[in-house]
Amino acid sequence: MFFKLLKDALKVKNVRNKILFTIFIIFVFRVGTHVTVPGINAESLKQLSDLPFLNMLNLVSGNAMNNFSIFSMGVSPYITASIIVQLLQMDIYPKFVEWGKQGEVGLRKFNQATRYITLVLAFVQSIGITASFNTLSSISLVKTPNVSTYLLIGTILTAGSIIVTWLGEQITDKGFGNGVSMIIFSGIIASIPKMFSTIYEDFFVNVRSGELTRSYIIVALLIVVGLAIVFFTTFVQQAEYQIPIQYTKLVQGAPTSSYLPLKVNPAGVIPVIFASSITTIPSTILPFFSKVTWLSHLQGLLSYNTPSGMITYAILIILFSFFYTFVQVNPEKTAENLQKNGSYIPSVRPGRETEKYMSSLLKRLATIGAVFLAFISLAPIAAQQFMHLTSSIALGGTSLLILISTGIEGMKQLEGYLLKRQYVGFMNLED
């Protein structure tokens, strides 16, 4: 189905150009991930390869942290800045609430504020990460560790993060898919060969002859679990709850009944990306507050290789699932639009009652989505910790979630482009 859809899409010039543009932008990003920051001893990173903090950073940076490249920060600062801006819109900061009522003008102001916050976060986190890695590695990461070197590295990494964010925006505006998701998606795809190579070495090369049977069993279980994750993720991400809609007789040309589709997991994979980004923050700012004891405890609390870290990661995913569900679907606006269009939900009064009904339904759907996302993300981490498996397995669930969700959204976008083209062609024939 996918290949047929892709074949049909490539026949359409506009869609083909979008796909080729996206591939070009991703190529530019991937090239940048191999350009190491000047003044860095990249060999020292090999000692840190098993750190949960580094693995999580690699995930949200699109696998750019392995070489401590100019794009090492990836879209992580932008994701964090987006969370901050969206939270401030919720009756927390009056000016942001006011902007939310200004339509396109307000949206441009939000985008500008997000960019400024991204700039500050990227610079602070860049220096923090460099200092953290330099401290943790026995081989000095920074060849000449002084203030001017740290400022230079921070500036380069900040510029890299801004460029990656801009590349993501170009994909969203002119290309195919969501830019942030596509950047992370490309990094996960690029890391797959290394992951399989690591699994092969850990289970079949660096083992004693008597442990081969155990290795075969574990690998077989991993394949089964991986296929199960693919199946259930695909099912949940495509599942819809259909709310019946009826129209008043006063609406000319409207059908007598229809339905309003809501995804069973309305927030998609964004809560996982948000949670992953948030867990990296304490480690990036810890060098600035090394004497603050509670911050060290917070770093341990957010490290997913500890029981408390796994619980915290799950809680963050659940909280962001509820938060982003109501960002995606606004019950008040939905009720208002239904009333304006002369439509209503059977047995539910238009207006305030419809808003309450939508809020209640969204909470139930968000609960299903949150539990699903948390389970898929946490299961491989728990398995890796309690069965002492290779660290490359830990974020396998999170990676699969992002891969499958981004792939499904991409297919739907392709279908939308093709349907729109067929509709426009039909209308032209009618004329």
Predicted regions and their residues:
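N-terminal cationic and glycine-rich segments that engage phosphates or anionic surfaces
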Residues: 1-431
